[in-house]
Amino acid sequence: MGQTLSEPVLDKHSSSGGDRWLHFGVSHMQGWRISMEDAHCALLNFTDSNSSNPPTSFFGVFDGHGGDRVAKYCRQHLPDIIKSQPSFWKGNYDEALKSGFLAADNALMQDRDMQEDPSGCTATTALIVDHQVIYCANAGDSRTVLGRKGTAEPLSFDHKPNNDVEKARITAAGGFIDFGRVNGSLALSRAIGDFEYKKDSSLPPEKQIVTAFPDVVIHNIDPDDEFLILACDGIWDCKSSQQVVEFVRRGIVARQSLEVICENLMDRCIASNSESCGIGCDNMTICIVAFLHGRGLEDWYNWITQRVNSGEGPCAPPSYAELRGPNTIADARNLQLEYDHIASHEYGSGDTYDSDSDDETIAYDRYYLH
C-alpha cells in the first residue's frame, strides 16, 4: 500500500468539456497517499477535423506506482504515440492501441533516465471513433465501465497476478506469485514501466513477467448507452462497478455536473482513517463521459432523469446525491473476497473482444461485474 499521511489531502482538481456528441467531467484527489501518482487525459478532438479519418476522441486514466514519472509520460505522450502508428490511419484501431502501448513502453525503456526508475503505471483508455464505436484498451487494474440504462457493463479486465492467464505468463517467464503479488511485490500483472520485470531479452514484450500489452474491447455505441466511466483502483477497491453506475445516475438526476459527481464519489470513497488496510487510502481519479446521442446537455440530463423516474434501470437512493464522507469499509467488505474467488477466464493475453457478443458479455458479467 505504501506510506500514508497523518491527514488526507482532500483538495480536488477537476475539469470538464464537451461538444455536440460527448460531454465529460474528470477529477482527481491525492487522498491519504504521500504524493499524487495518478494522471489522466481527455481529448475530445483527438484527430484533426480536416483528417480523412473519422473524428475520434480519447480518454485515459493512468494509475502510477513507485513514482509518478511513467504516469505523467503516458498522459503527455501515449495519445500521440498511438496516433503515430500506421495502423491508426488505416482504421485498424485495435492494432494501433496494442502497438501504441508497446511503443510507449519501449520508448521509456530506451530512455536512460528511466532505465533505473522503479515506477510504472496502469493504463485504461477509451478511443471513441466517429461517435459510434468505443475501443477500450487496458493494461493493469484500472477499469473502464459502461453505464447502460443503469446497468454496469465492463469494457476492461482487471489484470491481477492470480488470474490463470496472467499466472501462466508470469511463471513461464521465470516469475512467481507470492501473496497475490508478482515476485511478492507488484499487485498487478500488466503495466507500462516496471522494467525490472521486463529484462528477459529472449522474450517478446507480450511474454515478459509483466507486460504493457493491453486487452482491447470493442463496443458499438447503442442508443441505450448513457455514459462511460474510467477510474483507477482507488475507486474500484471501494465501490463495485454497479454501485458507481448507480451513484452517477443519482447525481445526474440531482442535476449535478459530471465533475461534481466525480468529486462526490471520491468523498464517498475516502477512508475516515488510514487503518483500513489500504481501502480508501489510495490516490483517486475518475472520468465520466456522457453519450449525448445528438441531444443538448440539458436534454441528456432530462432523458436520464425520465428513465430513472419511470423505473428504467437501477439508481442509487436520492440521499446519495447529498451524501458525503467515507463509507468504504461497508461497501468494500466483500470485494476482496470476491476477487479471491474469481474463476479463471478463458481469454489469452492481448485479445480483442466484441462486447456485443452474447457469450462474451455473459462471460464478462460472470467474471468481472461485481
Curated annotation (Swiss-Prot):
<keyword id="KW-0378">Hydrolase</keyword>
<feature type="binding site">
    <location>
        <position position="64"/>
    </location>
    <ligand>
        <name>Mn(2+) 1</name>
    </ligand>
</feature>
<keyword id="KW-0597">Phosphoprotein</keyword>
<dbReference type="InterPro" id="IPR036457">
    <property type="entry name" value="PPM-type-like_dom_sf"/>
</dbReference>
<comment type="subunit">
    <text>Monomer.</text>
</comment>
<dbReference type="Pfam" id="PF00481">
    <property type="entry name" value="PP2C"/>
</dbReference>
<keyword id="KW-0904">Protein phosphatase</keyword>
<feature type="binding site">
    <location>
        <position position="63"/>
    </location>
    <ligand>
        <name>Mn(2+) 1</name>
    </ligand>
</feature>
<dbReference type="GO" id="GO:0004722">
    <property type="term" value="F:protein serine/threonine phosphatase activity"/>
</dbReference>
<feature type="binding site">
    <location>
        <position position="63"/>
    </location>
    <ligand>
        <name>Mn(2+) 2</name>
    </ligand>
</feature>
<protein>
    <recommendedName>
        <fullName>Protein phosphatase 2C homolog 2</fullName>
        <ecNumber>3.1.3.16</ecNumber>
    </recommendedName>
</protein>
<keyword id="KW-0479">Metal-binding</keyword>
<comment type="function">
    <text>Dephosphorylating regulator for many key proteins. Has an important role in osmotic stability and cell shape control. It may negatively regulate the osmosensing signal transmitted through wis1 map kinase.</text>
</comment>
<dbReference type="GO" id="GO:0007165">
    <property type="term" value="P:signal transduction"/>
</dbReference>
<feature type="binding site">
    <location>
        <position position="233"/>
    </location>
    <ligand>
        <name>Mn(2+) 2</name>
    </ligand>
</feature>
<dbReference type="InterPro" id="IPR001932">
    <property type="entry name" value="PPM-type_phosphatase-like_dom"/>
</dbReference>
<dbReference type="GO" id="GO:0046872">
    <property type="term" value="F:metal ion binding"/>
</dbReference>
<feature type="binding site">
    <location>
        <position position="282"/>
    </location>
    <ligand>
        <name>Mn(2+) 2</name>
    </ligand>
</feature>
<comment type="similarity">
    <text>Belongs to the PP2C family.</text>
</comment>
<dbReference type="GO" id="GO:0005634">
    <property type="term" value="C:nucleus"/>
</dbReference>
<keyword id="KW-0460">Magnesium</keyword>
<feature type="domain" description="PPM-type phosphatase">
    <location>
        <begin position="23"/>
        <end position="291"/>
    </location>
</feature>
<feature type="modified residue" description="Phosphoserine">
    <location>
        <position position="357"/>
    </location>
</feature>
<keyword id="KW-0539">Nucleus</keyword>
<dbReference type="GO" id="GO:0030968">
    <property type="term" value="P:endoplasmic reticulum unfolded protein response"/>
</dbReference>
<dbReference type="InterPro" id="IPR015655">
    <property type="entry name" value="PP2C"/>
</dbReference>
<keyword id="KW-0963">Cytoplasm</keyword>
<keyword id="KW-0464">Manganese</keyword>
<dbReference type="InterPro" id="IPR000222">
    <property type="entry name" value="PP2C_BS"/>
</dbReference>
<feature type="modified residue" description="Phosphoserine">
    <location>
        <position position="355"/>
    </location>
</feature>
<dbReference type="GO" id="GO:0005829">
    <property type="term" value="C:cytosol"/>
</dbReference>
